[in-house]
């Protein structure tokens, strides 16, 4: 590793005193090309060490997180607020299934536009079991369980939560900010809960408290807190 600290500042230092660089000095029998390759490798090794240090720092910020640590710079537009009116219970219970699906897709598009997503996820409605919904990054689709459509607040919570996951995956590919890197590292080390035979989940707390899940919940709260 290249050392750059503790270098004397005087201009008349004898060569043998500049010891910090002696550990990367190529042997005298090396050719010019071998010496160049040697120095290049030293720089590469130093860069890898720096990358490992950064990765460890990111990893330390991924797990054991809570929503009160997350600050999301996002405000609901008038358009989004207007669409959310469709999900208030008195209105929602009078709507047909087709009208509900239209409102879901309209909200997804409005949120996706606000998040500046490259592509709005397709909405897939299924008659599922115990899952509210999920986002599939490979196909850019959000699957929603129609069995929970009777609760419009929970539906909005699920939809916006999964829309945030779509945003996270997009930003993890861009990698322009520290938060983008957090998304990337978390997805690379994502913890999924495992169902237990007798009911319940294994690793649920680890799943629940990882950064991308905490961030998605905090984002969804911005919508549901206006509906209660």
Locate predicted features.
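Short alpha-helix carrying the canonical HExxH Zn2+-binding catalytic motif
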Residues: 151-167
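Residue-level detector of alpha-helical secondary structure
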Residues: 14, 28, 36-47, 56-63, ...
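Catalytic zinc-binding patch centered on the HExxH motif and its immediate surroundings
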Residues: 114-143, 148-153
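Zn2+-dependent metallopeptidase catalytic core
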Residues: 97-119
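A short, surface-exposed helix-loop junction/capping segment
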Residues: 71-98
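Catalytic Zn2+-binding segment of zinc metalloproteases
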Residues: 163-179
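Metalloprotease/metallohydrolase-associated module, dominated by Zn2+-dependent proteases
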Residues: 119, 177-228
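Non-Sec secretion/translocation targeting segments of pathogen effectors
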Residues: 1-17, 41
């Amino acid at each position: 590793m290249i050392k750059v600290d503790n270098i004397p500042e005087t201009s008349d230092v004898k060569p043998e005193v500049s010891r910090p660089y002696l550990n990367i000095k190529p042997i005298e029998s090396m050719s010019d090309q071998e010496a160049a390759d040697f120095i290049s490798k030293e720089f590469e090794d130093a860069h890898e060490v720096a990358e490992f240090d950064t990765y460890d720092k990111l990893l330390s910020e991924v797990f054991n997180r809570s929503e009160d640590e997350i600050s999301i710079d996002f405000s609901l537009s008038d358009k989004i607020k207007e669409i959310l009116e469709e999900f208030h219970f008195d209105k929602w219970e009078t709507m047909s299934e087709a009208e509900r699906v239209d409102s879901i897709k309209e909200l997804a598009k409005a949120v996706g536009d606000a998040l500046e997503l490259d592509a709005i996820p397709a909405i897939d409605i299924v008659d599922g079991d115990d899952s509210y919904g999920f986002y599939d990054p490979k196909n850019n689709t959000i699957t929603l369980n129609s069995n929970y459509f009777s609760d419009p607040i929970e539906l909005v919570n699920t939809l916006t939560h999964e829309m945030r996951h779509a945003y996270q995956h997009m930003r993890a590919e861009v990698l322009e900010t520290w938060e983008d890197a957090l998304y990337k590292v978390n997805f690379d080390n994502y913890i999924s809960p495992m169902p237990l035979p007798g009911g319940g989940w294994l690793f649920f707390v680890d799943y629940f408290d990882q950064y991308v899940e905490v961030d998605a919940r905090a984002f969804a709260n911005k919508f549901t807190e206006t509906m209660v």
